[in-house]
Swiss-Prot record:
Mn(2+) binds at N172, E238. It catalyses: a 4-hydroxy-3-(all-trans-polyprenyl)benzoate + H(+) = a 2-(all-trans-polyprenyl)phenol + CO2. Homohexamer. It comes from the Bacteria. It comes from Marinobacter nauticus (strain ATCC 700491 / DSM 11845 / VT8) (Marinobacter aquaeolei). It is found in: Cell membrane. This is 3-octaprenyl-4-hydroxybenzoate carboxy-lyase. Catalyzes the decarboxylation of 3-octaprenyl-4-hydroxy benzoate to 2-octaprenylphenol, an intermediate step in ubiquinone biosynthesis. It is a peripheral membrane protein. GO terms for biological process: ubiquinone biosynthetic process. InterPro entries: UbiD, UbiD-like_C, UbiD-like_N, UbiD_bacteria, UbiD_Rift_dom.
Length: 495
């Protein structure tokens, strides 16, 4: 099913039993986080807090709190179907030339579909039903969560930040958290390699004395939100990709203060500017690592206009030690990454980002090994091929007889197929998430690759072990007599 706006999605989730309305009064200061955290860890529904303490605006949380809801938001019925989205992105990232006239004709509908998904700009839109400007702008009227006891203040956690670099047609969409520091001031915490930060840096170099226009959408439709966190090729805009997910063109409307365009159905839109040299210390905040991050300087976004739908819904989340909502998103998007990696490295069988590894800091890869040193090539490929993995600290590579998603299998491979000195690759002075306080320098640290594959001649001079396995014939004979043995053990009985 496709969703034109956030309200369509909320309505469908409620019909499916995937959303719970909370009518009791709940405080956005800490209480919502505790309720959301307990619910998410139990695999529970999305939560719509209808009576946040001190506010008359409902709060939607845990929207993507299960992989199933992520898949639904992408217009799919289950997580497995996300592989097809990954295949589409892999093709768009590096399209294969047609093998002949027939192949070209078969691929033509896909190219037509992409071309038809350019956004549609409307003259008016629901997101501009109510307009608040200048001195009437007051971010404190929005029920922004204060998530953890040690947080520096309220934090906007699901902002869809819309930017454009100088002389660029393509707009960038990104999710960058924002600390509220005044009635019209937010700290824009974007890392230097992210699209929004790159747009800003280019603008500032070209226009050192001019304010930089920014728009922020809160509560867009699910396809647009998820498009902003998916590895979309640079040649395709997130708005166009959202249209592909939805099956219809993304509807936009011109912002009032700049040439940016915002999602027409968004619940709330913030418009304003980042002024030259306007910086502020951001944090500390509890983060997806399970720790409070250190304080650092980031640009300040001055909000000069707020527009919203009638009776708007504020979309929020929290981040903390996994599993949290970003970790769940990582589990689902893992399925999108696999075909993209396999397009470049066909030898990869599976790729897994364990949520307990903060969704991106550790990767397990299984592969069909073809020559000595092959595992190291795959390690380097993971680190360099997609921007999403430039901060991955640990890459474990195993053979395809190992289940990448089963730690018992992975640990067995590490402890039986690795020599620590020979099979560990250390790379120093590489980009590292600045939130990683374990690195010796902020933003710069090392990476470790672990070759847990069976070793080939040239990698070892010793006779290599053969894994123990029972014959299929014996397994079948035992299956046939199992019921007569009287052994009642869950999991031991044949299917």
């Amino acid at each position: 099913m496709k969703y034109n706006d956030l309200r369509d999605f909320v309505s469908q989730l409620e019909k499916l039993g995937e959303l719970k309305r909370i009518t009791a009064e709940v405080d956005p200061h800490l209480e919502m986080t505790e309720i959301c955290d307990r619910t998410l860890r139990a695999g529970g529904p999305a939560l719509l807090f209808e009576n946040p303490k001190g506010y008359d605006m409902p709060v939607l949380a845990n929207l993507f709190g299960t992989p199933k809801r992520v898949a639904l938001g992408m217009g799919q019925d289950d997580v497995a179907a996300l592989r097809e989205i990954g295949k589409l992105l892999a093709f768009l990232k590096e399209p294969d030339p047609p093998k002949g006239f027939k192949d070209a004709i078969e691929k033509l509908p896909l190219f037509r579909q992409v071309m038809r998904m350019s956004p549609k700009v409307l003259r008016s839109a629901p997101c501009q039903d109510v307009v608040i400007e200048k001195d009437k702008v007051d971010l404190y009227q929005i029920p922004v969560q204060h998530c953890w006891p040690g947080d520096a203040g309220p934090l906007v956690t699901w902002p869809l930040v819309i930017t454009r670099g100088p002389n660029k047609e393509r707009q960038n969409l990104g999710i960058y958290r924002q600390q509220v520091i005044g009635r019209n001031r937010l700290i824009m915490r974007w890392l230097s390699h992210r699209g929004g930060a790159l747009d800003y840096q280019e603008f500032r170099k070209a226009n050192p004395d001019k304010p930089y226009p920014v728009a922020v959408a809160l509560g867009a439709d699910p396809a647009t939100i998820l498009g902003a966190v998916t590895p979309v090729p640079d040649t395709l805009s997130e708005y166009a990709f959202a249209g592909l997910l939805r099956g219809s063109r993304t509807e936009l409307v011109n912002a009032g203060l700049s040439d940016l365009q915002v999602p027409a159905s968004a619940e709330i839109v913030l418009e304003g500017f980042i002024y030259p040299d306007d910086m502020a210390p951001e944090g500390p905040f509890g983060d997806h690592t399970g720790y409070y991050n250190e304080v650092d300087q980031f640009p300040v976004f001055t909000v000069e206009r707020i527009t919203h739908r009638r009776d708007p819904i504020y979309h929020s989340t929290y981040t903390g030690r996994p599993p949290d909502e970003p970790a769940i998103l990582g589990v689902a998007l893992n399925e999108v990454f696999i075909p993209i990696l396999q397009k470049q490295f066909p030898e990869i069988v599976d790729f897994y980002l364990p949520p307990e590894g903060c969704s991106y800091r550790l990767a397990v890869v299984t592969m069909k090994k073809q020559y000595p040193g092959h595992a190291k090539r795959v390690m380097m490929g993971v680190w360099s091929f997609l921007r999403q993995f430039m901060y991955t600290k640990f890459v474990i590579v195993t053979d395809d007889d190992v289940n990448a998603r089963n730690w018992e299998d992975v640990i067995w491979a590490i402890t039986t197929r690795m020599d620590p000195a020979r099979d560990t690759t250390l790379v120093e002075n590489t980009p590292i998430d600045y939130l990683d306080f374990a690195s010796p320098v902020s933003g710069l640290g090392s990476k470790m690759g672990m070759d847990a594959t069976n070793k080939w001649p040239g990698e070892t001079d010793r006779e290599w072990g053969t894994a123990i396995a029972m014959t299929d014939e014996v397994k079948q004979r035992v299956d046939d007599i199992w019921d007569s043995l009287g052994i009642e053990i869950p999991g031991a009985r044949p299917d």
